[in-house]
Amino acid sequence: MGKQEIIKIIRNKKPEMESRYGVQRLGLFGSYVKEKQGKRSDIDILVTFNRDIDLFDFLDLREYLESRLSFKVDLVMESALKPAIGKRILSEVEYV
């Protein structure tokens, strides 16, 4: 699966994620956005929520994405980014 297919799937499922989980914004970053993924690469997704969510909803969203994409997903909240790595991630993220 390539970057464009991942973006298409996320875009198609975004309305459901907005209503179910309070997702405000999703973005792809890491090896898939650079198109340098390997067979064992996970899909790195940056998320912003429009409401407070608990750990169970966060983990449920990750499982939801993994089941739709059929790959392991590394889900990262934009609000939890550390300054050093956050700058790099924000410079490469492609929002869906």
What positions do the PLM features span?
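Short hydrophobic/aromatic beta-strand micro-patches
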Residues: 46-48
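Conserved histidines in hydrophobic membrane contexts and catalytic metal-binding motifs
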Residues: 28
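Catalytic core of pol beta-like nucleotidyltransferases
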Residues: 1-25, 33-39, 50-96
